[in-house]
């Protein structure tokens, strides 16, 4: 309420959807639950927007079929989120699949956002991957930010400081302009076509 930023909360079970819906702006279905069909059915009946993260080993077709499950429940407020897939590479937490952006935009009408924080697991990779996501046409970004990442209770290694986040946003504005996109006035909500 103080910042005006929307709150996204991960819901883990179908039984928790109505409770979580009372306290959040957007319901998140995490990567591990992308094929939890009872949960997809429940968020499909919810009145709040749903952020559907891609699973570690989920193909584009499987991800879009999971999205269809939500849409079939009556909830058309659906956002897809690329957050990295599992590959043989071990340096990063995951491999961020930026190819997913134009593929999903071609195959679906749904907006796609990118989470380079979870997609890489390393703060120094967040900015370049976020900028690449904007250039590739992402509708928005999810970025972990913390005033002191070394003291964060979770996700510190992938969190940007406020200063680094400001630098990222300066870069986002520049890349968005270069690819003829606009950054929303409430910048953390992302890039608009």
Residue map of PLM features:
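Catalytic cores of alpha/beta
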Residues: 15-22, 60-66, 121-139, 147, ...
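N-terminal active-site wall of soluble small-molecule enzyme domains
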Residues: 1-24, 36-39
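Glycine-rich phosphate-binding active-site loops on the catalytic face of alpha/beta enzymes
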Residues: 31-35, 133-158
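Active-site/ligand-binding-proximal alpha/beta "capping" segment
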Residues: 71-133
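Alpha-helix-loop-beta-strand connector modules within alpha/beta enzyme cores
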Residues: 1-7, 42-49, 98-113, 158-181
């Amino acid at each position: 309420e103080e910042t005006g930023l929307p709150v996204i909360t991960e819901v883990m079970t179908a039984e928790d959807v109505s409770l979580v819906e009372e306290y959040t702006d957007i319901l998140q279905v995490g990567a591990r639950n992308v094929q939890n069909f009872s949960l997809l059915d429940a968020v499909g009946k919810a009145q709040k927007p749903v952020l559907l993260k891609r699973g570690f080993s989920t193909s584009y077709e499987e991800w879009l079929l999971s999205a269809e499950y939500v849409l079939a429940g009556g909830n058309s407020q659906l956002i897809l989120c690329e957050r990295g897939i599992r590959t043989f590479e071990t340096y990063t937490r995951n491999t961020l699949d930026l190819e997913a952006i134009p593929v999903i935009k071609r195959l679906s009408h749904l907006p796609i956002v990118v989470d380079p924080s979870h997609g890489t697991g390393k703060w120094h990779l967040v900015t370049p991957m976020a900028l690449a996501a904007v250039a590739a046409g992402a509708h928005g970004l999810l970025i972990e930010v913390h005033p002191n990442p070394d003291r964060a209770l979770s996700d510190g290694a992938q969190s940007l400081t406020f200063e680094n986040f400001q630098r990222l946003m300066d870069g986002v504005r520049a890349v968005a302009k270069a690819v003829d996109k606009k950054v929303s006035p409430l910048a953390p909500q992302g890039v608009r076509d």
